C-alpha cells in the first residue's frame, strides 16, 4: 500500500519495509514467543478496513499524528473499504455546503461491509435538532447511506442504525446486522479466513458447542452447521440483541444465545448459581465436547480458564499474543496444541490475531 501520509498519520504505526516484510517480522515475533510455526493468513494490502473514525477539523478529516501530539488532516485513507473510500470525499463536500452540518462537527465515523451498505455517524459538540435532521436527511438520500447524529444526550437516526453485512463462508452467504457503535470485526477479508479456519476444525468434531464471548454471532452462525446444538454466551446486551436478530435472519434453529459473562457461565455449569436468563434452557440436555473462546485482550480469567480445561476440544481465537501465551501455559497441562494460525487483521500495525486448536 502506498500512502502519502505514512510516517505522519498515527493509524499506521508500521510503514517501513513494505507489507510482506512487516508481516514476516510479526510472525517471527510470534514464533519466538510460542515456539510454534503457525499457518499464516495475510490481509489485502489496501482497502480492507470496514470501520474508521476521523476527527473533523475546519472542513477536513483528521487523524492523530504518529510520533507527536496534534492532528494531521487527510483527504483520503488507503486502509478503508472501497465503499468508504469513495464516500469520504463526497460526504465531506456535502457536509461543508451545509453550515448546520459542519458547525462544531467533532468526529465522523464510517461503518461499511462487503455488502456495500454504509452507515455514517456524525458526533457534535453542540445540540442537534430538526433543522440538522432535515439537512442530514438530504445528504443521506443523495449518497444512499444511513446516518446517525449524536450530541450530548441525544441521538437522531436517519434511516437505519445498522448495516446488513453479507459474508461468504465456504460458498454460503451469511447475513449480519452490524450496529452503529457496537463491536464488529474490522477486516472482513481476514474475518472470513478466520471463520473458515475454525470451520475446517469444527467439521470433524462431535457433540455440542459452547461458545464464550460470542459477540453478535460472527463465528456462531457459520460454525453452527457442524454441531447438533450450540449455546453461545455474551455479556454485552446490544451484542446479544444483534445475535438473536442475526440467527433469525439466517434461519438457523440449533443455536441459543444467552446474556451471560464467562464467569456466570462457569457458575451455571457447575451448579453454583441459578440464572433466570437460563430458565428456558436445559443445560443438562447439552453434550458439550467443544468450547470456542474469543476473549478480549485480557484473555481468560482464572475461573474461565479452569472451565475451558474441562472440554475435550478447545478453539481459542486471540487478539493478544501475550495473554494467549499465559493461557496456553495452563491449558497445555491438560491439552495438546494441534493447530495454530495467525491472521493479519491489522496491517501496518504491530497487532496480530491468532488461533489455536487444542485437544485433550
UniProtKB/Swiss-Prot annotation:
Q: Which InterPro entries match?
A: MeTrfase_TrmA_AS, MeTrfase_TrmA_CS, SAM-dependent_MTases_sf, TrmA_MeTrfase, U5_MeTrfase_fam
Q: Catalyzes what?
A: uridine(54) in tRNA + S-adenosyl-L-methionine = 5-methyluridine(54) in tRNA + S-adenosyl-L-homocysteine + H(+); uridine(341) in tmRNA + S-adenosyl-L-methionine = 5-methyluridine(341) in tmRNA + S-adenosyl-L-homocysteine + H(+)
Annotated SUPFAM superfamilies: S-adenosyl-L-methionine-dependent methyltransferases (SSF53335)
Identify the residues that bind S-adenosyl-L-methionine.
185, 213, 218, 234, 294
The EC code for this enzyme is 2.1.1.-, 2.1.1.35
Give the annotated active site.
319, 353
Organism domain of life: Bacteria
State any single GO MF term.
tRNA (uracil(54)-C5)-methyltransferase activity, S-adenosyl methionine-dependent
- Name the UniProt key words of this record, in alphabetical order: Methyltransferase, S-adenosyl-L-methionine, Transferase, tRNA processing
> Is S-adenosyl-L-methionine included in the keywords of this UniProt record?
yes
Q: One GO cellular component from the entry?
A: cytosol
- GO biological process annotation, one example: methylation
Determine if Transferase is one of this entry's keywords. Answer: yes
Supply the HAMAP family for this chain: RNA_methyltr_TrmA
The record's PANTHER family line, in alphabetical order, gives: TRNA/TMRNA (URACIL-C(5))-METHYLTRANSFERASE, TRNA_TMRNA (URACIL-C(5))-METHYLTRANSFERASE
What function does this protein fulfil?
Answer: Dual-specificity methyltransferase that catalyzes the formation of 5-methyluridine at position 54 (m5U54) in all tRNAs, and that of position 341 (m5U341) in tmRNA (transfer-mRNA).
Instruction: Give the family per the record.
Output: Belongs to the class I-like SAM-binding methyltransferase superfamily. RNA M5U methyltransferase family. TrmA subfamily.
Q: What name does UniProt use for this protein?
A: tRNA/tmRNA (uracil-C(5))-methyltransferase
